[in-house]
């Protein structure tokens, strides 16, 4: 073995040998070279290693006898007390100069080898190029170099190795970064470094594309650095202030004061810039969404003009962001980088061969003592020592630093440049490349790496150890100091500087007052409305009409005049009524009011509009005179203005621009914003002034469209497909449902864009745009209140997308009643999410039809889940499948309606032709639904109509039961497990198909007759619920099973009585159900209802159903109870288990033992719970076993460094296996599944080029699995031969004599 050593090193090593090892015991047995290998390093010299002296390219060294290495590894285990730093520094003078000093602290958390393994360096300070990135993890901050004592190892013969002792002082329990902090922050040198010609400035051109994510990262890092700087200097300032009395001069104190003020100034400036940047970023996002929405909306002249304006605004926001980035970059300070040298380290690498020495590790870590272990390092020759020299090239944006260095024979390094300055950049990383110089034309790339810079913003200098090559054997040591000040202003006086200053002046608006809402200029689709449109006060006040007129405003500027004499009563109107009228109507109807109420401010408003403003025509025959704003001082009516071009844009495509009629927005219809957007953008038909009432209806109600919609059409389709896909081949009904749903989805996706309502398209524009500007609706609107008139000219602003007028009121207004149009328009307008990347939602063009489809899709999803849960109980699944079949027919009708473009039908008969055969039911539904939505009605509205039509008759026969009866009917129509609460009626929707399907399936032709029957059930239920315990017991004992109908409400009440704490009541109900179960009709209906209740999500009802099935002795429900035993709720699992055990004696199964006596089911259930607890505890202890071992790598058999991660384990699919043949079939299927999983893992390992895994599976598992499957197959064949014939008339498996002999004679000895 060869080791490159200098003769002077051997002499020095021999001098220290007596300090660490007893020379009298070891000295005579070691050669001089082996003696030299015992020399360690001082603690702060840990990373320094002996240089390899090369002479003419060949290693000059001496032989190291193998026996010396073996003897050292087993015998020499010296230990010494650690010396203080002063002694170390004295000893350092007698040693030759080595590589630069780097403090290194170990890390255990990132150690791949563990405390007992040989650990490589993990001090990666960056990420390298593509070739090295494949085998190295990307780390911004290095976790440090780890050296820990390990088992004694040595190299096998044939490899040139170095053997050394490494100092370890319990380093493996510590953690550090590669950024080493000194005790105090270095002060900026007085003489500024001379920057290189290409380093003294940065790119003066602002970036073309903003980088928001990177700006946020750098902002956070810069802010943390400034905070740290401020904290450090304030600490020193407080220290000097305390010592001020003892000081004659306080000049240093003044310097700290200046630094403190400078840091605070920079912090404020950085925060202001970042806030402005965030605003511009959000404006850019909003403009981007507007571009998408307008690009997909129907083409028109106004739309094209608006799109052009959006593009201009988007470009300006982008330029503003780039300008702010450049300004922020100038506040980043500077990085002072000092070259500390290159360090080479030897490492154990993949491919090196070594073996561990047997025997326990004799070392024990104790505080204050130093131990040594023998470590065999990797072979030499990979660039660990650079003989000729090295060239380092650093690149940071457009900044460059090239330096050349040489490593002398004695290990001293000399570099032609030791320090430089880099100006930090927002975008970009520091790229470092190191090249070894072999000759004049021979250069070898040692490695290259790219380093993150955001961690360098720190108050104290940091020493960074950068791994240059992939193995970490070459490190570049740099000392980086960040100075946040003294950066010359390199921004030129012209160009971007002026724009930055102007931008800062504009951004000051955001910090000093109310933020301006973005606007389009004169061609926008939506203009401003005053804040108090949505004001509401006392409900007793009358509706206040607000006139919304189209007026001709130049450049989109809005002028609003507020009356100082507004009455308080008008300010608190309860239900504002918004009327949209053309300008000529406003002029004719309000001219007298204008004359009496106009003041000087309104006159100035007229002047601001321009005297020679030309009117624009709505059509060829009609012209609109420019109108003045008007205020009605008596009623508080305020005129709202929209641009005339908006009116043209909204009416041109509907061919109704010649006749514009006023419209009232009704507060009964729900959200006023949705109505406003719908009216402003609707092109479906003419709009009338009067409210539309259906004859005989309780009130006009469209329910604000999608306010009832729980999710969009896309969500409903996705949810149903997700529930249906795994089981769609299980039943024919599932296949039919999948076919119809797919057809309906295709119909909606294939509908042309023109068939979709324009209101939906443009409402999406409002939604997607105004939601982007939510951040502008701050509380600043409440901070500034002025009397008189306010004139705003924001329409012409080039840096905004929409404009919102800031309206101030002089009257007393309730704070919660104050609203802002942009905030109101930001609410959900009912437009769904996009599909397939398109901003247009999936829709039929009719909101009522959309709601109907969503409700039926959601109900189908619920039915599919219930059918899957009850699939092992045929009679329950059959009942649910019948319901699903009816829903398939409904979806078929919905697809036909959507495909034939009948979304705007106004008659229910067109959707359900069979409805004309039941005129009473049809007449009642037409009273419940509104003309805008014939497909659905709210539950609250339906109940109101029921009360208006049938409440008198119901209360006459059953006083006070009308409302419970109506709520029970609604819950049955919706197929709910229990009656709806009064609070939830307003959010529930009933579709016309649900209404018709329920009544026809129950044979109802007259609604009043059905309500009378339902009232009798409700009366009986309330009687049972209201009785005291004694009376209830008497009633239950007197009731005959034939006198109590097996209806849903009665059955539910009886089951809930079983959950009472009173044992006597529970026992009485149990006895009644047991007696009633003898009635076949009652038992059939009760069994079906309670089994279906097990599939519901109501936990209380599930528990009650279990107890009821227990009372009915319903063995038919055993399989459903077994499934319920796997519930996530402990209480349900317990009740289901007890019910299952109680049904065992009646099932005639093998669970009933003939020796069972005095062994209650409750005790058996408790024993089973204990058994399962022990089983889970053993599973948990298995996991804890891996935790208590400190390192998984040390586990026997874990050759790859993996981890054991446990998953939930389900119970076996059945508790009884019947006869031996069935059990063997189940075992064979289990082994086949296991073998298939092994084959899949083998295929994955082969695809990932993992030969070790493939070989491991082939040699240990796959061969054994094949043999086992073969043997089980043979047993199964023999079992089928010896098993006797199964009697056809019995449903219980009977074991034959052949099976018995096979078990005893064959399986017992196998």
UniProtKB/Swiss-Prot annotation:
- For region Disordered, the annotated ranges are 588-639
Q: Does the keyword Lyase apply?
A: no
Residue spans of biased composition, Basic and acidic residues class: 609-631
| Domain of life of the native organism | Eukaryota
Principal localization? cytoplasm
Post-translational modifications: Phosphorylated. Chemokine-induced phosphorylation in neutrophils occurs in a PKC- and AKT-dependent manner, resulting in RIPOR2 interaction with YWHAB and stabilization. Phosphorylated by PKCA, AKT1 and MAPKAPK1A; in vitro.
Q: What is this protein called?
A: Rho family-interacting cell polarization regulator 2
Species source reads Rattus norvegicus (Rat)
């Amino acid at each position: 073995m060869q080791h490159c050593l200098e003769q002077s090193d051997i002499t020095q090593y021999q001098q220290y040998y007596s300090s660490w090892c007893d020379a009298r015991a070891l000295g005579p047995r070691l050669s001089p070279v082996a003696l030299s290998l015992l020399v360690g390093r001082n603690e702060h010299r840990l990373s320094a290693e002996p240089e390899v002296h090369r002479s003419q390219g060949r290693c000059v060294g001496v032989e190291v006898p193998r026996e010396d290495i073996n003897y050292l590894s087993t015998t020499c285990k010296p230990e010494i007390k650690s010396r203080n730093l002063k002694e170390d520094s004295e000893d350092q003078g007698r040693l030759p100069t080595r590589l630069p000093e780097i403090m290194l602290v170990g890390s255990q958390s990132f150690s791949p080898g563990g405390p007992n393994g040989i650990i490589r360096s993990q001090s990666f300070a960056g990420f390298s190029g593509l070739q090295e990135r494949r085998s190295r993890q990307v780390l911004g901050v290095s976790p440090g170099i780890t050296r820990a004592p390990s088992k004694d190892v040595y190299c096998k013969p044939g490899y040139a190795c170095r053997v050394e002792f490494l100092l370890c002082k319990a380093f493996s329990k510590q953690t550090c970064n590669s950024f080493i902090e000194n005790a105090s922050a270095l002060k900026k040198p007085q003489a500024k470094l001379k920057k290189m010609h290409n380093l003294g400035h940065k790119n003066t051109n602002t970036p073309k594309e903003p980088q928001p994510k990177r700006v946020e990262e750098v902002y956070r890092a810069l802010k943390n650095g400034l905070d740290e700087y401020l904290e450090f200097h304030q600490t020193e300032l407080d220290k000097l202030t305390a010592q001020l009395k003892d000081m004659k001069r306080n000049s240093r104190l003044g310097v700290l004061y200046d630094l403190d003020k400078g840091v605070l100034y920079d912090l404020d400036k950085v925060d202001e810039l970042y806030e402005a940047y965030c605003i511009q970023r959000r404006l850019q996002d909003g403009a981007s969404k507007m571009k998408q929405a307008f690009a997909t909306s129907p083409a028109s002249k106004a739309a094209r003009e608006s799109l052009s304006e959006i593009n201009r605004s988007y470009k300006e926001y982008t330029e503003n962001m780039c300008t702010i980035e450049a300004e922020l970059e100038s506040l980043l300070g500077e990085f002072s980088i000092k070259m500390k040298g290159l360090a080479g380290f030897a490492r154990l690498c993949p491919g090196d061969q070594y073996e561990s020495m047997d025997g326990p590790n004799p070392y024990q870590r104790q505080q204050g003592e130093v131990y040594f272990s023998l470590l065999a390092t990797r072979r030499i020759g990979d660039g660990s020592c650079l003989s000729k020299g090295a060239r380092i090239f650093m690149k940071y944006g457009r900044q460059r630093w090239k330096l050349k260095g040489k490593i002398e024979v004695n290990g001293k390094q000399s570099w032609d440049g030791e320090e430089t300055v880099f100006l930090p950049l927002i975008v970009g990383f520091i790229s470092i490349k190191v090249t070894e110089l072999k000759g004049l034309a021979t250069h070898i790339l040692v490695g290259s790496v790219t380093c993150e810079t955001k961690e360098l913003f720190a108050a104290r200098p940091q020493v960074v150890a950068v791994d240059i090559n992939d193995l970490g054997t070459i490190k570049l040591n740099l000392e980086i100091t960040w100075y946040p000040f003294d950066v010359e202003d390199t921004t030129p006086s012209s160009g971007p500087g002026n724009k930055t200053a102007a931008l800062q002046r504009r951004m000051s608006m955001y910090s000093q007052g109310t933020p301006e809402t973005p606007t389009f200029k004169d061609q926008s689709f939506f203009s401003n409305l005053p804040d108090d449109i949505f004001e509401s006060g006392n409900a007793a006040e009358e509706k206040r009409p607000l006139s919304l007129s189209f007026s001709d405003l130049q450049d989109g500027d809005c002028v609003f005049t507020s009356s100082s004499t507004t009455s308080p009563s008008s300010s608190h109107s309860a239900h504002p009524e918004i009327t949209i009228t053309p300008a000529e109507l406003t002029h004719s109807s309000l001219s007298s009011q204008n004359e009496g109420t106009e003041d000087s401010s309104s006159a100035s408003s007229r002047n601001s509009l321009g005297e020679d403003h030309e009117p624009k025509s709505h059509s060829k025959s009609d012209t609109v005179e420019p109108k003045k704003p008007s205020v009605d001082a008596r009623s508080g009516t305020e005129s709202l203005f929209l641009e005339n071009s908006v009116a043209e844009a909204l009416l041109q495509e509907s061919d109704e621009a010649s006749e514009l009629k006023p419209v009232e927005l009704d507060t009964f219809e729900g959200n006023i914003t949705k109505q406003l957007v719908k009216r402003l953008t609707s092109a479906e038909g003419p709009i009338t002034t009067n409210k539309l009432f259906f004859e005989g209806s309780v009130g006009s109600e469209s329910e604000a469209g999608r306010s009832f919609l729980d999710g969009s059409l896309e969500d409903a389709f996705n949810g149903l497909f997700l529930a249906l896909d795994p089981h769609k081949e299980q039943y024919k009904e599932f296949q039919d449902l999948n076919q119809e749903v797919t057809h309906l989805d295709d119909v909606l996706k294939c509908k042309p864009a023109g068939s979709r309502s324009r209101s939906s398209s443009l409402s999406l524009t409002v939604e997607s745009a105004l939601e982007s500007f939510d951040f502008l609706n701050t509380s600043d609107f409440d901070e500034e209140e002025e009397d008189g008139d306010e004139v705003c000219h924001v329409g012409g602003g080039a840096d905004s997308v929409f404009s919102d007028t800031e309206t101030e009121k002089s009257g007393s207004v309730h704070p919660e009643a104050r609203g802002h149009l942009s905030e109101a328009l930001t609410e959900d307008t009912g437009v769904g999410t996009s599909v397939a990347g398109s901003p247009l939602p999936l829709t039929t063009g009719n909101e009522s039809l959309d709601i109907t489809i969503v409700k039926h899709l959601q109900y189908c999803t619920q039915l599919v889940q219930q059918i899957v849960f009850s699939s092992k109980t045929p009679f329950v699944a059959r009942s649910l499948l019948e319901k699903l079949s009816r829903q398939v027919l409904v979806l078929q009708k919905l697809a036909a309606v959507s495909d034939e473009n009948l979304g705007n039908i106004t008659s229910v008969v067109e959707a359900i032709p069979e409805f004309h055969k039941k005129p009473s039911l049809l007449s009642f539904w037409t009273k419940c639904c509104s003309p805008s939505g014939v497909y659905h009605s709210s539950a609250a509205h339906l109940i109101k109509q029921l009360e208006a039509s049938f409440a008198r008759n119901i209360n006459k026969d059953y006083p006070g039961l009308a409302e419970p009866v109506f709520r029970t009917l609604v819950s049955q129509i919706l197929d709910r497990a229990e009656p709806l609460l009064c609070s939830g009626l307003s959010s529930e929707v009933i579709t016309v198909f649900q209404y018709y399907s329920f009544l026809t399936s129950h044979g109802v032709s007259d609604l009043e007759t059905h309500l009378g029957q339902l009232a009798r059930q409700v009366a009986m239920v309330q009687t049972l619920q209201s009785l005291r315990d004694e009376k209830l017991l008497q009633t239950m004992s007197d009731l005959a099973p034939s006198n109590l109908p097996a209806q849903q409400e009665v059955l539910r009440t009886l089951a809930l009585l079983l959950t009472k704490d009173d044992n006597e009541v529970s026992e009485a109900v149990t006895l009644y159900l047991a007696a009633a179960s003898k009635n076949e009709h009652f038992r059939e209906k009760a069994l079906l209802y309670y089994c279906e209740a097990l599939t519901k999500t109501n936990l209380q009802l599930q528990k009650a159903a279990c107890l009821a099935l227990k009372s009915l002795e319903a063995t038919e429900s055993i399989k459903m109870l077994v499934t319920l035993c796997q519930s996530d709720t402990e209480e349900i699992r317990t009740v289901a288990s007890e019910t299952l055990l109680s049904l065992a004696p009646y099932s005639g199964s093998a669970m009933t033992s003939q020796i069972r006596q005095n062994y209650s089911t409750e005790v058996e259930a408790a024993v089973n719970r204990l058994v399962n607890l022990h089983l889970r505890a053993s599973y948990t202890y298995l996991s804890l076993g891996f935790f208590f071992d400190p390192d998984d790598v040390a586990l026997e058999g874990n050759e790859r460094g993996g981890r054991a991660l446990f998953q939930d384990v389900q119970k076996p699919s059945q508790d009884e296996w019947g006869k031996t043949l069935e059990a063997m079939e189940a075992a064979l299927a289990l082994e086949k599944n296991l073998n298939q999983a092994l084959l899949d893992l083998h295929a994955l390992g082969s695809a990932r080029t993992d030969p070790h895994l493939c070989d491991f599976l082939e040699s240990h598992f796959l061969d054994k699995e094949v043999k086992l499957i073969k043997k089980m197959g043979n047993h199964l064949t023999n079992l089928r031969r010896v098993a006797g014939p199964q009697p056809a008339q019995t449903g219980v498996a009977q074991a034959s004599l052949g099976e018995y002999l096979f078990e005893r004679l064959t399986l017992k000895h196998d």
